[in-house]
């Protein structure tokens, strides 16, 4: 029995894909930070190039790094402020939950329905354990950030030399195609990340404003949560609506809870289904199914950071596959249908 050349190539491609995924999972401690560094480099490279035309290269690199560190400082400051806002509210929330638990327990006992007793002290202990876990996570994130910055510096130092290296490594026709494909992919990916950041900012601002209008506690925190979670398309938008809705429902009553839910759902729907696609263009859109599979798959490969990078990674693969005839079918299967 003979196997055709096409079948052999297909089998080889499948085997190679499996091996690459296994390698990425086995080397997650270095491959995941490298992916983060790559996406950051794609974002900041135009700024670095602009600065290099006016300043020495070493100074432009320092300014770009200072800008990134400043951005991270703002993010850490926002998280710290959120923690300071939440901390004094915890006892009040636990007391309220204790009262609701007792009311529910009394109602259930009258109807002979077994229900476990809620203890506020147990809640405090759980919050403390979560806080300790959060501190460990922050320490891990700090070491990860240092590694990402180190890789980013090396990437930015080498980025201006990659075209010459490609020309020396491949024949002129192939090297031109590779350089054009990488440049086009980087430009489109940069647009995607910038538009995504813009829509996340708008979502966070509108979420915080809506919660503030309806008197929902921790409005700033819910805006920050919405900003972060909307980097995870589809799934993040759904999760971002749940916490403020529950807080409004429990502490402000059913009418405000429903108003909060409806308002936040409208914000997510308009920005996710109308504003973002109009800014991105259809060629950079994923179907909700592919987006969800991307999040789950890359989350399995790299954990939570992989879930955050899932959609950008998939879009990068689609853009690169679209540039070559042999892989264009993969791009069509993963992307939206073009009119």
Predicted segment positions?
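Anchoring transmembrane alpha helix of integral membrane proteins
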Residues: 1-80, 152, 314, 319-339
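Alpha-helical transmembrane segments and their immediate interhelical loop/hinge regions
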Residues: 9, 140-250, 254-262
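Hydrophobic transmembrane alpha-helices
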Residues: 20, 37-41, 68-71, 152-155, ...
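Membrane-water interface of transmembrane alpha-helices in multipass transporters/channels
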Residues: 29-36, 213-225, 252-260, 286-291, ...
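Juxtamembrane membrane-interface segments in integral membrane proteins
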Residues: 47-55, 62, 75-147, 159, ...
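Short amphipathic alpha-helical coupling elements at transmembrane boundaries
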Residues: 49-53, 85-88, 92-99, 103-106, ...
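Membrane-interface starts of transmembrane alpha-helices
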Residues: 55-64, 116, 175-178, 218, ...
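Hydrophobic alpha-helical transmembrane segments of membrane transport and translocation systems
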Residues: 257-339
